[in-house]
Amino acid sequence: TFPVGAKLDLAAGREYMFDRVYRQQPERFYTTDMHGVDWDKMTAAYRRFLPHIDNNYDFAELLSEWLGELNVSHTGGRFYPKGQSEPTASLGLFFDWNYTGKGMLIAEVVEKGPFDTANTRVKAGTVIEKIDGVEITPDADYYTLLNNKARKKTLVSLFDPQTKEHWEEVIIPITNGAFSDLLYSRWVKQRAADVDRWSGGRLGYVHIESMGDDSFRSVYSDILGKYNNREGIVIDTRFNGGGRLHEDIEILFSGQKYFTQVVRGRETCDMPSRRWNKPSIMVMCEANYSNAHGTPWV
């Protein structure tokens, strides 16, 4: 092996990418008139900003503004920087931000988080006093104490204001990405509880997280499993980023009962047995994107 050095002309690289977008759009745009936009004129209007851009954050914004003139979805520019130099871990907790004393007052322990275990004494109302021996003062930002702590054993010093007891526990913080997944599950569980309460147990609830296989399998399992005997189902598609699932969803929720199987005088199942045969309603919002935007219209 031997060392090799290279000098990159970043400005020339951005100009190349700009020109590539300019050439490709007329060839690939879904209508030949490009929504009536004079592409050459529009390109010239945005090209004049190019010499003044010295970073990829701004370059991505330029591409997005330029392509946005076409007034069509699924276009734009994105810049993905390298990962954080010091990613901050999560304890899987919500805190009471009105609390003004020392430490952090826990408002909620998130289900399946680091403190949601059988051997912890932490609960809502517990105060975290220290993290790895560093005291949390009212004017301190406790997040810095969790830098680079994901998946690493961390000592947490705790206090119960009711019993006046102090103790310590060792936990393993999770990444913020993992915490986001827990918050999503928490949100779905809360929405399902709302529907169950408001309908008096008559309706089920499922959320389609994305238009992909994993989401479909989860929805399929719930509607033909725990919600199989409900009178109807609420299908929530809000905040779904898309994929390609509209045909599968249409088939799954458009079943028409044609037969009821009876065994020894008892109804055992309806046919089709692998499709939803009862009423359903689909919820959407402005944050639905791509295939998730189109699916409610199917």
PLM regions and their residue ranges:
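Sequence signature of WD/YWTD-type beta-propeller architectures
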Residues: 1-76, 187, 191, 217
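Cleft-lining beta-strand/loop regions that shape enzyme active-site pockets
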Residues: 11, 15, 26-30, 34, ...
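PDZ/PDZ-like groove recognition
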Residues: 22-47, 92-110, 202-205
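Extended, small/polar residue-biased N-terminal targeting/export presequences
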Residues: 49-102, 165-190
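PDZ/PDZ-like domain segments forming the peptide/carboxylate-binding groove
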Residues: 86-138, 213
